[in-house]
Amino acid sequence: PQTVQGFCMRIMQGEEYGKLYQLSEFATHGYRILTIGREPDNLLPVTEQQSTYVSRHHCTLETTPSGDHWIIRDGQWQKEQKVWQESSNGTYVNSAQVTQQGYRLKVGDIISIGDVKMRFENY
């Protein structure tokens, strides 16, 4: 049996095709909540210059203390306004819309945000 060392997200479609985000590396360094979006202040900034379908603060990934699974949620917590703000165009996993309540990712899942598609993988 294959030993899983960690989890990552690989961009499969979009301006940064092939880019790899090592999610487990973030978790190792104490980051259990990762933000994804167009703005550079996200822990996982996604470049989308051809359109603006990816929100500035699009979605959130969260892991357990053990790092054995990840949950994706549409939107991000906005500290200043003290409110959860959903993305403009939604977050999808395998073409199904994800809400703020979240979805537990499985290896091979395809995440779509705007025109960008990413695959959840293990290594």
Residue ranges of predicted features:
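Intrinsically disordered, low-complexity acidic Ser/Thr-rich regulatory segments
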Residues: 1-52, 62-67, 106, 111, ...
